[in-house]
């Protein structure tokens, strides 16, 4: 193992004090979301177990959990493969995210603290500056952080839980768009933050819905162009 390699799953489990199957689940999910495991790619349990330095049992349990969430397809006698996101399914996810994001922004405008607003402003400014430099590799993580802070500012535990359960699946669809939309996306983020700062719940709702709608249209345009 060289200095840049992540530690084995077993070591990370010890550090985080989490069940082995959860650590394996998170690692496989991470590989799918960031594209190391491509849509439609076959997943071999024994190979994955060897790479993660675990037995096949936690790998099998992780794949079953990922199947239930739509990341993996399990085929009888053929094993597992990464799911393929159809255009219809992606559109459904965008519509769901638009509804949730609008509600989150509306509540954030009404309930945010000064500290939460400051953090949103900080990340929005950092994201815009990063997009301006062309450092696209850093944008997905900043985008995730922005939307996490936005959700936290809404101060609604049930809504936060709903968003969290969907966040990785949605990020899987969003990642390419986040990097390619660049400065446009971060201009939209700033407009959401401005509305929240002014306490304008209706405008915050509209800006957030427009932001997700623009991402959806860009994604669908890409899909049509690829045909």
Over which residues does each language-model region extend?
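Mobile beta-alpha loop/short-helix "lid" or hinge segments that flank ligand
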Residues: 68, 72-73, 165-168, 181-183
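Short helix-capping/hinge motifs at transmembrane helix termini and TM-loop junctions
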Residues: 109-110, 155, 178-179
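C-terminal regulatory/effector modules of DNA-binding transcriptional regulators
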Residues: 2, 27, 179-227
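Short linear motifs at protein or domain termini
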Residues: 1-110, 216, 220-227
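Conserved amphipathic alpha-helical segments that form helical-bundle/coiled-coil interaction surfaces
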Residues: 93, 97, 114-175, 186-194, ...
């Amino acid at each position: 193992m060289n200095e840049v390699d992540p530690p084995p799953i077993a070591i990370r489990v010890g550090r985080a004090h989490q069940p082995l199957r959860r650590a394996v689940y998170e690692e496989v999910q991470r590989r799918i979301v960031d594209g190391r495991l491509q849509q439609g790619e076959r997943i071999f349990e024994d190979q994955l177990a060897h790479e993660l330095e675990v037995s096949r049992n936690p790998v099998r349990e992780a794949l079953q959990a990922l199947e239930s969430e739509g990341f993996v397809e399990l085929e009888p006698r053929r094993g597992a493969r990464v799911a393929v996101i159809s255009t219809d399914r992606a559109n459904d996810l965008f519509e769901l995210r638009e509804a949730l994001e609008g509600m989150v922004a509306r509540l954030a405008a009404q309930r945010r603290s000064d500290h939460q607003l400051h953090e949103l402003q900080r990340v929005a400014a950092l994201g815009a500056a990063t997009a301006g430099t062309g450092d696209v590799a850093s944008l997905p993580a900043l985008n995730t952080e922005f939307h996490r802070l936005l959700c936290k500012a809404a101060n609604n535990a049930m809504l936060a839980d709903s968003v969290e359960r969907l966040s990785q699946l949605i990020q899987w669809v969003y990642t390419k768009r986040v990097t390619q939309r660049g400065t446009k996306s971060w201009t939209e983020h700033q407009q959401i933050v401005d509305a929240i700062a002014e306490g304008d719940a209706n405008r915050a709702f509209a800006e957030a819905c427009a932001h997700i709608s623009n991402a959806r249209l860009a994604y669908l345009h890409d899909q049509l162009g690829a045909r």
